Amino acid sequence: MLQNKSSEENFPQSSVPLPAQQSFADFPPVGINSLALYTPGFYLDLTELAQARGVDPNKYTIGIGQDQQAVAPSNQDIVTMGAAAGLKALYFADSADASDTGHTNIGLLVVGTESGVDASKASALFIHDLIGLGPWCRSIEIKEACYGGTAGLMTAVDYVHTHPGKKALVIASDIARYGLNTPGEVTQGAGAVAMVISENPRILALEPQSTVYSRSIGDFWRPVYTDMALARGKYSTEEYINFFHRVWKQYKNETGRSVKDFAAICFHLPYTKMGMKAFRGVLDNDISDSKSADNNNNKTGASADSDISAHTHGHFLKETLEKRYQASTLYSRQIGNIYTGSLYLSLLSLLDHDSSLSSGDRLGLFSYGSGAVGEFFSGILQDGYSHALHRSHTQTLLHRRHKVSVAEYEKIFNDAIPYQAEDVQTDQVHRDPWNPFILDRVEGQERIYRRL
């Protein structure tokens, strides 16, 4: 394995401005028009898992910040989960656009995943068929670890910008598996998040400025002969933090923005404490710098009052951003790690749980995919965005799940589709009645899907 040692890069001082004739101000805003979640109808209580593994439950629930973990039976994979989320995202978008009930405006379907079901055929094509999209549609799959969902989103935004009147469906779908009784077992999970990307979006208009950083490292990988990932956990956490600090510093250089310009920042969350590990240092440094700048600008006059004002504002800002970070983790605490969808699960959780956000607020998003790619970008909440959310639907999805015992979870885990050339009938006992799609069987080395 190649191990590249990092070196200090010289950050460019500014990005090249767009020519006037190509200014983004000349085009309609593009972004997230609808947002939908699917996660399997079964979950494991991590306190019970900790007890079965002889571990203090606080290590799971407090130490890494996880309470429950989604469990996917063999009849559910990234295709069935992605189709369920995608169908809901289309329905949510159609509820506000009676002109496109046939989805004819969807010109691009892109699936970001690191749990692909075929080395040749894109999972997007299976999903395209299951949800009934028309044939005049580009359907592709993108892979770069947990960054794949963001790669799909950026591809979709570019597509919509260059195809006026068209929309794109982006699906981030994954099953995180590390093995029974392994260090990574507590950070497993399963689910899919789907987004319709359009002009004049109802939820979040993405801003053109983003900063992306790539470097080949060996923090996490999954060989093609297994569905279980391998990781250097401590090293991966260090690089996650390092990548965030790098892209944040570069983003600040390019835009002149700091944390005070954001109402909230959402993170990719392999586990819910991880984002705060990266955020805390930046938060403290930026607020400290902001206080110093405010104090320097108020050297004359009532400097004591200025000091108090700067301190009070800095404390309030930090408290607000930390509170909103916690709101962004609530769904992840109940579902676990869904790889490509984790950042967008964080976004959905924030929007569903924090009613103090307002239209016009700027949200920051940090995407990280091991191997590794990191990107920081932002978006502006749109007027009436809360009416485009479906919080009660998502809450019902989570509340109606069935809790499985540790023994039942282990049986389901071991029942996964094998990486062998054999016919397999999938689990017919653990069916989610709320997902109309299942993987029925593997026959002649082909996956056979069915709509119930």
PLM feature spans:
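A conserved active-site cap/scaffold subdomain adjacent to cofactor or substrate pockets
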Residues: 237-254, 260-284, 331-332, 336
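Condensing-enzyme catalytic core mediating Claisen C-C bond formation in acyl metabolism
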Residues: 2-75, 182-242, 377-452
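Intrinsically disordered, low-complexity terminal tails and inter-domain linkers enriched
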Residues: 5-16, 95-102, 287-309
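Acidic, glycine-rich active-site loops and adjacent beta-strand->loop/helix elements
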Residues: 37-38, 112-118, 144-149, 172-177, ...
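Catalytic phosphate/nucleotide-handling subdomain of diverse soluble enzymes
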Residues: 348-398
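Conserved beta-ketoacyl condensing-enzyme motif
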Residues: 32, 77-150, 257-283
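Short, well-ordered amphipathic alpha-helical segments that serve as non-catalytic structural scaffolds
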Residues: 56, 78-94, 123, 239-255, ...
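Conserved catalytic cysteine-centered active-site region
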Residues: 56-80, 114-167, 173, 285-294, ...
